[in-house]
Regions:
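Short glycine-biased active-site loop of nucleotidyltransferases that positions the nucleotide triphosphate
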Residues: 76-81, 255-259, 313-314
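Short, solvent-exposed turn/loop segments enriched in Gly/Ser/Thr/Pro and often Arg
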Residues: 9-11, 62-66, 247-255, 309-315
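A structural signal for well-ordered alpha-helical segments within the folded catalytic domains
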Residues: 36-43, 69, 105, 226-230, ...
């Protein structure tokens, strides 16, 4: 296996759209430069990896968090679909990009292109600090929303291994410093969801303190990354005509729980480089299993590992997912109905 990592532009240098940039572009597009960097890197790997012992017909892309969102976007972009043989996404999925028009208005507020080009790069970077530059439907890298492409089955039709962690978010992000009581939880959900609060509370109930913590953590996780990742898996399973393998990573790192990014050291096999934690034999066992599953998927498109529990494809609505922990096992996801409610509300209000 040959591993390639690539850098790409971020922030104002990676996603700044401006009407004057659009006008001078041969593709009549601006913004998404960081994603175009990734396409260029992918094309370079395709053109050159044979010289390093790799196979250009067997390129699997992977990423975590924003990197996972990038994997999703590369799968749906017309610029990169034909370069991909497989994909791995960890804790990041379907997003709702801005329109090019709104991204251009955001950029135009910074001034004219001539004024910006007259500034040193360091000044531009400093002035842009604190501003958000979104991925946009620019008509070139993205021609429509990722959900639309996935719903129509127009994405790269390749095997997909995708999942998220058990504690991507915390109930404290909903309740803040308030005690996790049912009344405070219901009030917080009411403030956030208004007329939809009853539907959310039925899906994520909080009838006692323990349930408030569990449902609040699930809701916060869904709002952060889990829902978008789940939606990616469901849409790809429905339309992609290739197997989709879904996981939920639940191994706690120290006493934090399976927080966002906790799986990275396990998946990449570099626990020993992080000396903050007193890793145990159980941690090593989780890491070994995760590395084997991921490596075999990269090589074959199927994470079947002799001696480990079978990881079934998740191409049916009630298909099981792999729980990655000290003792890997499959479960039918209990959270799926709650996620479906939240997704339907998001879709309703996006119209």
């Amino acid at each position: 296996m040959v591993v390639v990592t690539a850098n790409y532009r971020l922030g104002v240098f990676g996603f700044f759209a401006h009407p004057e940039l659009t006008a001078e572009s041969p593709h009549h597009a601006s913004g998404n430069y960081g994603l175009l960097d990734q396409v260029a890197a992918l094309q370079w790997v395709h053109d050159n990896i044979a010289a390093f012992g790799g196979d250009p017909a067997r390129i699997t892309i992977g990423g975590e968090s924003a990197g996972s969102v990038s994997v999703n976007l590369l799968m749906v972009s017309p610029l990169s679909r034909g370069l991909i043989a497989g994909a791995i996404g960890e804790s990041g999925g379907v997003i709702t990009p801005a329109s090019l028009d709104s991204a251009e208005r955001n950029g135009a507020a910074f001034g004219s292109l001539a004024e910006l080009r007259a500034m040193p790069a360091a000044v531009v970077l400093d002035r842009a600090d604190g501003h958000y530059f979104p991925v946009s439907i620019d008509g070139y890298f993205l021609t429509e929303s990722p959900a639309t492409t996935l719903s129509a089955g127009k994405q790269a039709r390749v095997p997909l291994l995708v999942g998220w962690n058990g504690q991507e978010g915390s109930w404290k992000s909903i309740l803040g410093d308030s005690a996790p009581t049912p009344a405070r939880y219901a009030a917080a959900v009411q403030r956030e969801y208004g007329p939809d609060a009853d539907a959310v509370l039925r899906a994520f109930p909080g009838n006692d303190s323990a349930q408030v913590k569990a449902s609040g953590t699930l809701l916060a996780s869904a709002r952060f990354t889990a829902l978008g990742t789940w939606k990616w898996a469901r849409l790809a399973a429905r339309t992609g005509q290739k197997p989709v393998y879904v996981y939920n990573y639940t191994r706690s790192r120290g006493d934090q729980g399976a927080v966002h990014s906790a799986e990275i050291e396990y998946a990449l096999g570099n626990l020993g480089t992080n000396r903050v934690y007193n890793w145990t034999g159980e941690d090593s066992a989780v890491s070994n299993a995760m590395q084997q599953y991921f490596a075999v998927f990269i090589k074959t498109g199927n994470p079947h590992v002799a001696g480990l529990p079978v990881w079934p494809a998740n191409n049916q609505p009630q298909a099981p997912i792999m729980i990655i922990d000290v003792h890997p096992h499959t479960e039918t996801p209990a959270f799926a109905p709650a996620f479906a409610v939240l997704d339907s509300l998001n879709t309703l209000h996006a119209r």
